[in-house]
Swiss-Prot record:
One cellular-component annotation, GO: cytoplasm
Top-level taxon of the source organism: Bacteria
Database matches in SUPFAM superfamilies: Glyceraldehyde-3-phosphate dehydrogenase-like, C-terminal domain, NAD(P)-binding Rossmann-fold domains
Keywords: Amino-acid biosynthesis, Arginine biosynthesis, Cytoplasm, NADP, Oxidoreductase
A GO BP entry: L-arginine biosynthetic process
Primary enzyme class: oxidoreductase
Matches recorded under Pfam families: Semialdhyde_dh (PF01118), Semialdhyde_dhC_1 (PF22698)
Any one GO molecular function term: N-acetyl-gamma-glutamyl-phosphate reductase activity
Catalytic activity: N-acetyl-L-glutamate 5-semialdehyde + phosphate + NADP(+) = N-acetyl-L-glutamyl 5-phosphate + NADPH + H(+)
Phylogenetic classification of the source organism: Bacteria, Bacillati, Cyanobacteriota, Cyanophyceae, Synechococcales
Active site positions: C154
InterPro entries found in the cross-reference section: AGPR_AS (IPR023013), AGPR_type-1 (IPR000706), NAD(P)-bd_dom_sf (IPR036291), NAGSA_dehydrogenase (IPR050085), Semialdehyde_DH_NAD-bd (IPR000534)
Classification via Gene3D superfamilies: Dihydrodipicolinate Reductase, domain 2 (3.30.360.10), NAD(P)-binding Rossmann-like Domain (3.40.50.720)
Protein name: N-acetyl-gamma-glutamyl-phosphate reductase
Length: 351
């Protein structure tokens, strides 16, 4: 199967090339990047060497579609929407890593991504409704039948995977959910950003996007769908001075305050026992971002505060892999009829 990587020179695209270059199921048919178009891949990224040393090409529907079955769109918010319909019309399936199709309503997207809505005059509400939310652990069947997959954001991935088992079974209350997340600097992308300079963020920790971070509504949309009730929650992201990795701590109130840590761990373990990339830790073992660096793995831990009937769930992911491109490859595998984790048997080089 021929795969186009559009936006190949950003962090997401670079990860995609690295994951697909030796994958027997796929052939990289196109590498797109406007700023570096006309130059050879190996000159730009000698550390991800490609035997064919292809040219990086200008991004256009014609260039993408001429030899491709699927396009991975690793692009800033808004740009994917200018390409998607035309690619679909040419028979190219689309896996979008931006937020353009994460909402079932274009109106909702325009509320959350208001700056992009001004810059990109969209008229594709039908595609918003068609797009499948690409969280493989909860949406595998729909992904397998889809032609447009919208990959979740990194924060929503780290929050929803721990939450879904408890929301879907009514274990926790719909009100009072709090998500506290920390992310490495690569989550901000590869474009220059003063806040991500080493001298600005090194040896420090800071919150950002307080109350109104864009991923809040994305988490709420999926959580509400899973629970069958409208959910409003509190989400606070933080920037930590590591290159990659994400740690989320989720707090909720148990409907049955008699449930123990062991009860909640068993429930979590049973829910994800068939997923190779998810490890549910013993009660009292708490995960570190170091454990998942450069892998598509997720580590989960849960503990109950019996004094007040609250549950605390921890999750760690690599924000560039399970939080972005690794998850896109899972979706690609499912769409293509392969095992979900093919090509993602990645080993952590601890420490």
């Amino acid at each position: 199967m021929n795969v186009a990587i559009v936006g190949a020179t950003g962090y997401g695209g670079i990860q995609a090339v690295n994951l697909l270059k030796n994958n027997k199921n796929y052939k990289i048919s196109f590498l797109g990047g406007n700023k570096t178009s006309g130059s050879k891949w190996n000159d730009n990224f000698p550390f991800i060497y490609l035997d064919t040393d292809p040219y990086i090409e200008k991004i256009s529907v014609e260039n993408i579609s001429k030899n491709s079955d699927v396009a991975l769109l690793c692009l800033p918010n808004g740009i994917s929407s200018t390409l998607t319909r035309k690619l679909l019309d040419r028979g190219v399936k689309v896996i979008d890593l931006s937020a353009d199709y994460r909402y079932k309503s274009l109106v909702e997207w325009e509320k959350v991504y208001s700056k992009e809505a001004v810059a990109f005059k969209r008229n594709d509400d039908d595609l918003c409704k068609e797009a499948v939310y690409g969280l493989p652990e909860i949406n595998k069947e729909a992904i397998s039948n889809g032609r447009l997959i919208s990959c979740p954001g990194c924060y929503p991935t780290s929050a929803l995977i721990p939450l879904v088992p408890y929301l879907s079974q009514g274990i926790i209350e719909n009100e009072g959910i709090v998500i506290d997340s920390k992310s490495g600097t690569s989550g901000g992308g590869r474009e220059p950003n003063q806040k991500l300079l080493l001298s600005e963020c090194g040896e420090g920790l800071s919150a950002y996007g307080l109350i109104n971070h864009r991923h809040t509504s994305e988490i709420e949309q999926v959580a509400s769908l899973i629970s069958g009730n409208k959910i409003e929650l509190l989400f606070t992201p933080h920037l930590v001075p590591i290159s990659r990795g994400m740690h989320s701590t989720i707090y909720g109130r148990l409907r049955d305050p008699g449930l123990t840590s062991d009860d909640c761990r068993i429930l979590l373990d049973n829910y994800y026992r068939n997923f190779k990339n998810i490890t549910v830790l013993p009660v009292g073992t708490f995960p570190s971002t170091k454990w998942v660096k450069n892998t598509n793995q997720i580590f989960l831990s849960v503990k109950v505060d019996i004094r007040n009937g609250r549950i605390v769930i921890l999750s760690v992911i690599d924000n560039l892999l399970k939080g972005q491109t690794g998850q896109a490859i899972q979706n690609l595998n499912i769409m293509s009829g392969f095992s979900m984790d093919d090509g993602l048997e990645l080993t952590n080089n601890f420490p």
